[in-house]
């Protein structure tokens, strides 16, 4: 069983690279803290595989979150404090996992990579 964590970010917000990096870092930590301890240990041992993908809207992001939760996957939302680029409370990303790669791919397999 191969594990990974997927972070999906909103491309419509047009965040700066630095801001985007911080949102992805927040998401990775949220997913780690919410995951089962046995999965967390295995994921760490495997090298902490992460993939960052993008969606075009908040609605699409929330749909991905709902689909992941319906499959029993751990998720978490990142909401920005609003101190720099976006208003307070803006949802910028969702994290899925870490969990089994094949399970996460059922939710995110068709999403484009963030480049």
Curated annotation (Swiss-Prot):
Cellular component terms (Gene Ontology): cytosol
Gene3D superfamilies in the record: Bit1
Catalytic activity, EC: 3.1.1.29
Lineage top rank: taxon: Archaea
One Pfam family, short name: PTH2
Family according to the record: Belongs to the PTH2 family.
Role according to the record: The natural substrate for this enzyme may be peptidyl-tRNAs which drop off the ribosome during protein synthesis.
Name of the protein this chain belongs to: Peptidyl-tRNA hydrolase
Taxonomic lineage: Archaea, Methanobacteriati, Methanobacteriota, Archaeoglobi, Archaeoglobales
